[in-house]
Amino acid sequence: MSKVIGIDLGTTNSCVAIMEGGEPVVIANSEGSRTTPSMVAFAESGERLVGQQAKRQAVTNPENTLFAIKRLIGRKFDTDEVRKDISISPFKIVKADNGDAWVDVRGKMYSPPEVSAIVLQKMKKTAEDYLGETVTDAVITVPAYFNDSQRQATKDAGKIAGLNVLRIINEPTAAALAYGLDKKKDEKIAVFDLGGGTFDISILELGDGVFEVKSTNGDTFLGGEDFDQRVIDWIADEFKKDQGIDLRGDKMALQRLKEAAEKAKCELSSSMETDINLPFITADATGPKHLTMKLSRAKLEALCAELLDKLEGPCRTALKDAGLSPSEVDEVILVGGMTRMPAVQKRVQEIFGKAPNKGVNPDEVVAIGAGIQGGVLRGDVKDVLLLDVTPLSLGIETLGSVMTKLIDKNTTIPCRKSQVFSTASDNQPAVTIHVLQGEREMASDNKTLGNFELTGIPPAPRGVPQIEVTFDIDANGIVHVSAKDLGTGKEQSIRITASSGLSKEEIDKMVREAESHAADDKKKRELIEARNHADTLAYSTEKSLKEYGDKIGDDEKKKIEEAVAALKKAMEGDDVDAIKQATDALTQASHKLAEAVYAKTQTEGGAQPGAEADGDTGAKGGEKVVDADFEEVKDDKK
């Protein structure tokens, strides 16, 4: 089995790790960073930029730079979360034909899995460059509180990126795996994961290589992006009060505010006050305007007080579901960049009554855990058993529009559960199975995962037919449902792809597009490499021609000059083969010149033996030095 990589596909940043020599290794990208911004930009030339390259040009290209796409993955357009995103995003979020939230960039629509796939391709390439071989198998992490639609969409993203997703693993569980791999003692831990866009809390029991999740809870729309937005709004409001100009109408200015807000928030984790300076942020009739203000840590905490308050509820629920009091938790592990904020750490200490453990790198620990899980699946890591849970209850709609639960939240997965139902009216020929996920009593208040029909039920009075509904959740937390008429043996089943989601045809089309983009990227890289090689050769040839041109005949010199000119002309075009041919032609033409350079070097080198002979006395002096050193060693020994 080939190498299995572990990818933390984050809202703000992504990270990739692998097991090597029995140890997890985080792989640095081509820019030398161990994390990669989860950003994708589309340049005017049609070129796609990913990661740091996309982030660097975001200010000048805000409408075509996509970030925090994870917050849209597996979501319907007509939801409060998406409406909130639309109000603050510089890029265009649109409604797809299936009702999902997609993005529109330069007139082309992209699904969130498609955009996430571009980031995953970057992580795949990072791993391949490091390993020197093709990688296809991967473990990808998701927030523990992701529902089935979001998990399926993440798996689709992996497929579009050309990855065989062996397992979808919950982020807090991955972090626990990284933390507890070498721990021998039994302990109960809480993993507090506050990242760029999501918040998870999981309670686990660790012991003898068994990692058992007891409960999980969270909020898939609470993270660093929301904290940044509070700072952005404050800066914009203060500037409007001061200058009478609302910067929210200027997308370029807004992108600068976003970067400044994120920077200020990070700086306030280690200092009590920071300066925000944005020269030439805008202009009016009186001239250019500069933005200069101070933000204190106390002010930041006041701005984000409501968000900090939201952290407590899920923690209390998770503890209650696990049947534990805060004092029974041995360690609280902090995961996600936002846990560096002192106010978050203070809130964690208040909830659990103990100082959190800061022994893991919050940016890398999830990818490390995914890498370890990859090692487990490959058989490289022995004696590790991961028992995860489903974060939300699963059930179907029954008479009176009530949700009847078949599998309760925090049930260990994989699992399978069946229940027998009947018809609601006489001679009912078919039943519609409305599959739901959530904790509310009424069906309409929960998330619809899908609908399917069991038909051909023989005429019978209500309550007589026996319809067995079976829920099956796999190790990825993805749901399969079947319904069987026990009287006739007739069965109907579906793998839930949600009432929205991507069809197989759409995924296949996106896979083909991703492959063609990868081929385009390869061609671009080949062109750049060919140009670089040609440029180096042309420069060195011209330099040698100036120095040694008088050592060769005029005809040879003319041939070389013509070959250099032909190569420079070829470099102006995009034909890789033409550049390579012109490069070869120049190499051939400059053979005589190379001989002249070599001959001169040999002549200069000919003086060296004489110099060495003259230096005999120096050599003897050198020997004396060695003797002296030797004498000193002797003295030391004495």
From Swiss-Prot:
Pfam families in the record: HSP70 (PF00012)
Biological role: Acts as a chaperone.
Species in which this protein is naturally found: Geobacter metallireducens (strain ATCC 53774 / DSM 7210 / GS-15)
Family indicated by similarity: Belongs to the heat shock protein 70 family.
Gene field: dnaK
PANTHER family from the UniProt entry: HEAT SHOCK PROTEIN 70KDA (PTHR19375)
Induction data: By stress conditions e.g. heat shock.
Name of this protein: Chaperone protein DnaK
Record GO terms (molecular function): ATP binding; ATP-dependent protein folding chaperone; unfolded protein binding
NCBIfam families: PRK00290.1, PRK05183.1, prok_dnaK
Biased composition (Acidic residues): 628-638
Keywords in alphabetical order: ATP-binding, Chaperone, Nucleotide-binding, Phosphoprotein, Stress response
InterPro entries to which the protein is assigned, alphabetical: ATPase_NBD, Chaperone_DnaK, Heat_shock_70_CS, HSP70_C_sf, HSP70_peptide-bd_sf, Hsp_70_fam
SUPFAM superfamilies in UniProt: Actin-like ATPase domain, Heat shock protein 70kD (HSP70), C-terminal subdomain, Heat shock protein 70kD (HSP70), peptide-binding domain
Region (Disordered) residue spans: 600-638
